[in-house]
């Protein structure tokens, strides 16, 4: 239930809501207004240790619950999430700022991840080969690995936690969750519904906070694996620190996703696709299109239509249904984004749509409108860096080959898209582009939960991605059994 009172956020440890043992807190504003809606604790190491102890104790019994029973329990959780979809979407819009339409879509994608977790009995099946030698059989068995942890970002406060803890718990593990201190309210509601579904205490524990919580998770000897989603520098740190302490780590990092626009594309659908990918969720997503490589032959026509359609987008509070671009998460991020726009102008790019001057229209929130640059090149920071905002750079290329070369020069390799009606172009793109997730006339090539989600290069640190069979492999340990009976 959403109220107007300012809330003091708590941790959830061993089945109970508890105050942090620390005294430091951080204010949580509504990004659309700047008004404080909550205070979140910046929990110390001691709170993490209590959560891990609770998870360890719960693991002794939870890991022995039959796999189908664990899945049935998760199905109850799935039903509660479905019953509370509207409330969950409103909480996301309140504390994250994205439009209610975008928030509703996120809720659905989170629910799909839990649907995957309910199918764990199929995904956890091992392998067997009888008679590998005279009278000897071989088999592979999958077992849970123990206490695992997830560290999640502000931009998808429902979907990304639900990539992690339902699947890990379905595999028989117990979980310590640290969500972004910028979006603590949705995390609270996810945990409330989890225990309404009847799970034993200590199976899922929530510790709110910042860097101290992250470091405590990475250094705790009883945590066996860590899942992370966030920026590239922090992902690299999480991976290096976690593996140094003997943990499995999957760290999904930053992005600079490119789209190549071919002359044979469907122009109207391509323009709408680029707009949706670049500017929905205020561009604060790792699968947003941030660079368009448009072939010269169609460039002028494409840009004219793109600019005209972009100028129609309304910016403002995500609760107002006419608004397409909501606020950025914080004032500090807004200032960072404005710095990138200013650098693009200073570096000589042509600013076709300027999202800086909108305060008179939208008030005191952390707003930056949809922004488009033309004439961008690889020497500019707006091409090189992840901006994480509704800022789109256009690079003109002579053909598909040059577009692929440009895309592959980025240090990031999360997603990439081609807009074309030519199957040969699509095949060439698919086979030569360096990206973990590829779209052909698909605006945001984020796969469904039964496929793995992960990028390449500086967009991912680790071996196994989230979701799908990758997720099950990450949260389980194999035992290879060779047996003979006399």
Swiss-Prot record:
Gene Ontology molecular functions: malonate-semialdehyde dehydrogenase (acetylating) activity; methylmalonate-semialdehyde dehydrogenase (acylating, NAD) activity
Binding site for NAD(+): 154, 178, 181-182, 231, 386
Domain of life: Bacteria
Keywords from the named record: NAD, Oxidoreductase
GO biological process: inositol catabolic process; thymine catabolic process; valine catabolic process
UniProt-listed InterPro entries: Ald_DH/histidinol_DH, Ald_DH_C, Ald_DH_CS_CYS, Ald_DH_N, Aldehyde_DH_dom, MeMal-semiAld_DH, MSDH_GmP_bac
Gene3D superfamilies in the cross-refs: Aldehyde Dehydrogenase, Chain A, domain 1, Aldehyde Dehydrogenase, Chain A, domain 2
Catalytic site: 286
Claim: Signal is one of the keywords in the record: no
Database matches in HAMAP family: IolA
Subunit record text: Homotetramer.
Family indicated by similarity: Belongs to the aldehyde dehydrogenase family. IolA subfamily.
Described function: Catalyzes the oxidation of malonate semialdehyde (MSA) and methylmalonate semialdehyde (MMSA) into acetyl-CoA and propanoyl-CoA, respectively. Is involved in a myo-inositol catabolic pathway. Bicarbonate, and not CO2, is the end-product of the enzymatic reaction.
Protein name: Malonate-semialdehyde dehydrogenase 1
Organism encoding this protein: Bacillus thuringiensis (strain Al Hakam)
Higher taxonomy: Bacteria, Bacillati, Bacillota, Bacilli, Bacillales
């Amino acid at each position: 239930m959403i109220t107007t009172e300012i809330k003091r956020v708590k941790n959830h440890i061993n089945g109970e809501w508890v105050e942090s043992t620390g005294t430091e807190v951080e204010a949580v504003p509504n990004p659309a207004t700047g008004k404080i809606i909550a205070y979140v604790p910046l929990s110390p190491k001691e709170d993490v240790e209590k959560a891990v102890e609770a998870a360890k104790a719960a693991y002794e019994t939870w890991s022995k619950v039959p796999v189908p029973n664990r899945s049935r329990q998760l199905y109850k959780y799935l039903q509660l999430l479905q019953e509370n979809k509207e409330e969950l979407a409103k909480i996301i819009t309140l504390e994250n700022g994205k439009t209610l339409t975008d928030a509703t879509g996120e809720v659905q994608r989170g629910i799909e991840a839990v649907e995957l977790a309910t199918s764990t009995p199929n995904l956890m099946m091992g392998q067997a080969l009888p008679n590998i030698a005279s009278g000897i059989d071989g088999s592979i068995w999958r077992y849970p690995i123990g206490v695992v942890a997830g560290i999640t970002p502000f931009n998808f406060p429902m979907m990304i936690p639900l990539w992690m803890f339902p699947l890990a718990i379905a595999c028989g593990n117990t979980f310590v969750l640290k969500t972004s201190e910028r979006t603590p309210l949705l995390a609270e509601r996810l945990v409330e519904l989890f225990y309404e579904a009847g799970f034993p205490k200590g199976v899922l524990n929530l510790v709110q906070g910042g860097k101290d919580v992250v470091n405590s998770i990475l250094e705790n000897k009883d945590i066996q694996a860590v899942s992370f989603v966030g920026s590239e520098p922090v992902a690299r740190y999480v991976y290096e620190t976690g593996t140094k302490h003997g943990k499995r780590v999957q760290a999904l990092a930053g992005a600079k996703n490119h789209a190549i626009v071919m002359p044979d594309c469907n122009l109207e659908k391509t323009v709408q696709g680029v707009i949706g990918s670049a500017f929905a969720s205020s561009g604060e997503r790792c699968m947003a299109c941030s660079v368009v490589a448009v072939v010269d032959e169609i460039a002028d026509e494409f840009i004219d239509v793109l600019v005209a359609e972009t100028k129609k987008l309304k910016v403002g509070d995500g609760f107002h249904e006419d608004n397409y671009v909501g606020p950025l998460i914080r004032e500090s991020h807004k200032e960072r984004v404005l710095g990138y726009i200013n650098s693009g102008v200073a570096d000589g790019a042509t600013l076709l749509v300027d999202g800086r001057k909108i305060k008179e229209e939208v008030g005191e929130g952390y707003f930056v409108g949809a922004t488009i640059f033309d004439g961008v090149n690889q020497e500019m920071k707006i091409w090189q860096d992840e901006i994480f905002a509704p800022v789109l750079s256009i690079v003109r290329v002579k053909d598909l080959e040059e577009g692929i070369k440009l895309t592959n020069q980025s240090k990031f390799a999360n997603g990439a898209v081609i807009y074309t009606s030519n199957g040969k172009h699509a095949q060439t793109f698919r086979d030569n582009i360096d990206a973990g997730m590829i779209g052909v006339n698909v605006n945001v090539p984020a796969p469904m939960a039964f496929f793995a989600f992960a990028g390449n290069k500086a967009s991912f640190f680790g071996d196994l991605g989230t979701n799908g069979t990758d997720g099950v492999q990450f949260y389980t340990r194999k035992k290879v059994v060779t047996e003979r009976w006399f």
